[in-house]
Amino acid sequence: RIFDTSCKGFYDRGLFAQLDRVCEDCYNLYRKPHVAAECRRDCYTTEVFESCLKDLMMHDFINEYKEMALMVS
């Protein structure tokens, strides 16, 4: 799963892979399918996506990932 059709912005396979990896890792942390789905919802722009970044101890990269999400959304 690399490309989300709800994303209407700039298509970059590398960006999608990085964003999707956060959601995959978050799913692996909690093992609840709704976590991955909510993380990806609205093209990675939900609070769940940001919470996943925090839960994965990626505090230093939150702004960078939010910018990536805006580029593809």
UniProtKB/Swiss-Prot annotation:
It comes from the Eukaryota. One of its GO terms (molecular function) is neuropeptide hormone activity. Pfam families: Crust_neurohorm. Its main location: secreted. Disulfide bonds join C7-C43, C23-C39, C26-C52. It is found in: Secreted. The keyword Transferase does not apply. This is Crustacean hyperglycemic hormone. It comes from Armadillidium vulgare (Pillbug).
